């Protein structure tokens, strides 16, 4: 029903409702009933596979099935081994799907995994496992529980070896020009503060400039490179017309990438400057032959960066650089600034060989290395701090609270385990330093931010 003005009566009535002080009142929710849930399931215009996907919370498969079958071609093997005399077999290239046995030969020409493999073979920068430094080493199998680690044996070894570890100085810096805009855009400044310090450390290397090639390993969305680009633009001289050169490397292709933001920021805030040149590689660092990657434009230095590159990826990156001309044969200067992370997933097969030897000299065999990586997680194993009560806010009864776990297999309280975990971190980092210095590189560690900003607050800096 509508009024003479054409406004629905319900809406007009709600818009004319005023409170005692003359301000309009919010409309009554009962006047706008919620949309009712569908009583019957959604109907599909095709015969849908009846298989419930266990890894998708038992959601029904969306593939089409034949009228005489319950399942689609992918799941028909769950009902019987063959259909009309035809047998389905697992694809030899990708075990994640099946094909008809009599169509296997044709399938090998159109399988997506086969196409990916052929594409990699055509690329000049892909070599399977070339950056795994210790392929002959015994791989770590699965995740070890705390009970399987002999703490009585390995904690004293950690304490004794820690005497050879260098102190990590605190160097918290700030890059005001490059991150000034960023600081005003975010309410939670934790990431911005870390980025500002890392970029300032890059500037100290002397290679934060438009003529450097910026290589971000484990780039993800390339958020760090976005603000590196902004910092370079903010510091650029007026007569500098060199286009900045970026290479992003990640084995995933994340959504909401910021590659375009680098170009947009330059257009909007620095319209007189040349637009950056960007190339993104989707590949695993373990297979990357860096010297084979084509360069987008001229450059006179290499700056390798990453923020919180996980343990295995850090070691693969270091080996990738040592296998390339960047840190060995090239005359161009090079520097590396990486915020370290996730040492609990370091692997003896990927850790620098000279670093493994350094640890072995201090009593860590393969089991000791596994124990070392396991105990690094103790840095974050302390009890979660209790939330401070807010005035006027109800708090749960004490008898409803879940008590913190007690009786850790190591026999140590949380604070003592945290100290041991930090020492294990430093031992792994010292092994990396030893390996890099053995190659003639200038390598050091710094605490680039406070631990309450990020528990992973150590940065590896390398200069050629």
UniProtKB/Swiss-Prot annotation:
One of its GO terms (biological process) is tRNA methylation. It comes from the Eukaryota. InterPro entries: Methyltransferase_TRM13, Trm13, TRM13/UPF0224_CHHC_Znf_dom, Znf_CCCH-type_TRM13. Its EC number is 2.1.1.225. Keywords: Cytoplasm, Metal-binding, Methyltransferase, Nucleus, S-adenosyl-L-methionine, Transferase, tRNA processing, Zinc, Zinc-finger. Its main location: cytoplasm. This is tRNA:m(4)X modification enzyme TRM13. It comes from Yarrowia lipolytica (strain CLIB 122 / E 150). The gene is TRM13.
């Amino acid at each position: 029903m509508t009024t003479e003005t054409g406004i629905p009566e319900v809406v007009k009535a709600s818009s004319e409702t005023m409170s005692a002080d003359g301000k309009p009142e919010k409309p009554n929710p009962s006047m706008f009933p919620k949309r009712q849930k569908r009583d019957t399931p959604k109907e599909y215009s095709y015969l849908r596979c009846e298989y419930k996907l266990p890894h998708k919370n038992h959601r029904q498969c969306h593939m089409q099935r034949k009228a005489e079958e319950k399942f689609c071609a992918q799941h028909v093997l769950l009902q019987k081994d063959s259909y009309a005399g035809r047998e389905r077999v697992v694809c030899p290239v990708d075990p994640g799907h099946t094909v008809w046995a009599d169509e296997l030969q044709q399938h090998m020409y159109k399988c997506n995994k086969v196409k990916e493999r052929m594409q990699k073979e055509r690329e000049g920068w892909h070599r399977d496992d070339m950056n795994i430094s210790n392929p002959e080493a015994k791989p770590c199998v699965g995740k070890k529980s705390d009970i399987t680690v002999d703490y009585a044996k390995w904690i004293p070894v950690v304490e004794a070896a820690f005497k050879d570890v260098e102190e990590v100085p605190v160097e918290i810096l700030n890059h005001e020009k490059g991150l000034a805009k960023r600081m005003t855009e975010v309410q939670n400044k934790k990431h911005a503060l870390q980025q500002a310090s890392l970029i300032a450390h890059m500037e100290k290397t002397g290679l934060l400039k438009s003529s450097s090639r910026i290589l971000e390993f484990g780039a993800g969305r390339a958020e760090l490179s976005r603000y590196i680009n902004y910092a370079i633009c903010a510091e650029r001289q007026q007569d500098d017309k060199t286009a900045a050169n970026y290479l992003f490397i990640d084995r995933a292709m994340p959504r909401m990438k910021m590659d375009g933001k680098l170009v947009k920021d330059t257009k909007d805030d620095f319209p007189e400057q040349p637009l950056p040149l960007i190339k993104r590689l989707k590949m695993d660092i373990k297979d990357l032959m860096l010297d084979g990657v084509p360069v987008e434009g001229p450059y006179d230095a290499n700056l390798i960066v990453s923020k919180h590159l996980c343990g295995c990826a850090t070691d693969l990156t270091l080996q990738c650089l040592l296998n390339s001309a960047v840190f060995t044969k090239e005359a161009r200067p090079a520097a590396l600034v990486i915020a370290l992370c996730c040492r609990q997933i370091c692997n003896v097969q990927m850790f620098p060989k000279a670093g493994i030897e350094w640890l072995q000299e201090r009593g860590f065999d393969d089991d000791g290395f596994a124990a070392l990586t396991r105990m690094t997680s103790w840095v974050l194993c302390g009890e979660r701090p209790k939330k401070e009560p807010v005035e006027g806010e109800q708090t749960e009864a004490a008898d409803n609270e879940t008590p913190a776990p007690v009786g850790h297999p190591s026999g140590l309280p949380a604070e003592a385990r945290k100290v041991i975990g930090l020492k294990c971190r430093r031992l792994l980092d010292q092994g990396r330093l030893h390996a890099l210095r053995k190659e003639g590189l200038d390598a050091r560690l710094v605490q680039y931010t406070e631990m309450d900003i990020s528990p992973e607050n150590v940065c590896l800096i390398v200069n050629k």
